[in-house]
């Protein structure tokens, strides 16, 4: 017999590798040299789901991990009660994490059998605030602001529904508002809602029982 593919060994043999792990954690983030929308390119993005503790061979976590690699820094997740709420939020451990800037998925679970409505409500709530921001930015265009802020506001209005580049546009607008908002109530109000400048990526996670039976009447 060739032996088993996996063998249990003492954990003590791996303690010498702890400094290597610590070194890897301290490495600076690297830019992805490929387009992340390709199969190969997606794997150069940092996963924002790690160490889930899901069952061996679980088919859910690879999909969830891939989604975090593509959209994780601006994700909102409405999670149906089931396996994905067990490996996804078994307190005090949470497998969803953040990137080097502190951005990552925001996760919530409804114990009731209404995850479709729950996720839709999350999306509609965010859309309402962003609509308010769009109206306030349109009004702010008439204010005597700098050319740079004027251009940033117009760009945000023109591309508010585009996911590509939304983080960069939001950062630029937020930074300029921080410089010019003093004593201007409308700009102060906009800056207070700066967390919504980024176009959020809303996801609804659930199993086939929920999607095709329990909650099929909904979204």
Predicted regions and their residues:
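Mobile "lid/hinge" segments at catalytic clefts and subdomain interfaces of large enzymes
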Residues: 89-127
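N-terminal amphipathic, basic-rich helices that act as targeting or association modules
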Residues: 49-81, 85-92
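Iron-sulfur cluster-binding cysteine motifs and their immediate structural context
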Residues: 1-14, 62, 72
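A short, small-residue-rich loop immediately preceding and capping a beta-strand
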Residues: 75-79, 200-214
